[in-house]
Amino acid sequence: MSRIGKLPIEVPKGVTVTFVDSVLTVKGPKGELCRTIMPEVSVAVEDGKISVTRPDDAIKSRSAHGLTRTLVNNMVVGVTAGYQTDLEINGVGYRAEVKGAELVLSLGYSHPVVFPLPSGITVEVDKMTKLAVKGIDKELVGQTAAKIRSFRGPEPYKGKGIKYATETILRKAGKTGKK
């Protein structure tokens, strides 16, 4: 048995879970998420708990067991608490602002970078240098944060660019002059 896959998922109050035709739908106070479950595993919803089981010990079933359980748990946590990833912008003149459904970034290029926000994602800007990417879908929040970071990743000499708030940048020493 998968150590992660065998654990049941508690369904909190205010959350409804339905499983019809290999599509799992989780509704909660923050929204609704749907996911197609792989045919290698089966999901059962009973007594306020969700359990993920596999029919056999085939390699594909074993690899999908823990993954499916974690994905379902992420859905339950997302519709109750939501997810947030924090980013920081370092550099002279580097800033961000939200205009409608777009994030406008000034990152030292000759033009501002305009990033349309996916539906279900909100970005809060604090002091033009701190971003908070929020949403109920953990995968989409992480993917959006990674895309924003990729516009100007942190460089190792001065540390300029966009980085995760928890990330530490390994700094390099610059060139030494001729002596």
From Swiss-Prot:
Gene Ontology BP terms: cytoplasmic translation
One Pfam family named in its UniProt record: Ribosomal_L6
Keywords, ordered alphabetically: Ribonucleoprotein, Ribosomal protein, RNA-binding, rRNA-binding
GO terms for MF: rRNA binding; structural constituent of ribosome
GO cellular component: cytosolic large ribosomal subunit
Protein family: Belongs to the universal ribosomal protein uL6 family.
Reported function: This protein binds to the 23S rRNA, and is important in its secondary structure. It is located near the subunit interface in the base of the L7/L12 stalk, and near the tRNA binding site of the peptidyltransferase center.
Name of the protein: Large ribosomal subunit protein uL6
Taxonomic source organism: Trichlorobacter lovleyi (strain ATCC BAA-1151 / DSM 17278 / SZ)
